[in-house]
Curated annotation (Swiss-Prot):
Species annotation: Schizosaccharomyces pombe (strain 972 / ATCC 24843)
CDD domains found in the cross-reference section: SNARE_Bet1
Lineage, broadest ranks: Eukaryota, Fungi, Dikarya, Ascomycota, Taphrinomycotina
Role summary: Vesicle SNARE required for retrograde transport within the Golgi complex.
TM stretches of this protein: 69-86
The protein's name: Protein transport protein sft1
Amino acid sequence: MNDQNERRLETLSGQVSSLKNVTYDIYSRANDYTRIDRATESFSGLSNSVKKSTENFFRVVRSAGRRRIMTMVLAIVGSILIIYYASKWFF
């Protein structure tokens, strides 16, 4: 009778251990899905921000002279490139 109880106890212990592992796996996957959802929301927000910035840029281009805007954009890009290459040359 004691041997039978010991076997049943070992079986029950194995089942409890399996249940713990399954529960931990479910918890881990739920955390992964939560992380994925947060990343998706973040990228969605970034996409909306870029879209709004683009719309605002084109609205400014339409209202102001194109030549003046393009000159300003080229000056900004040129300045960034000059700073970038100058910093590489000095450091």
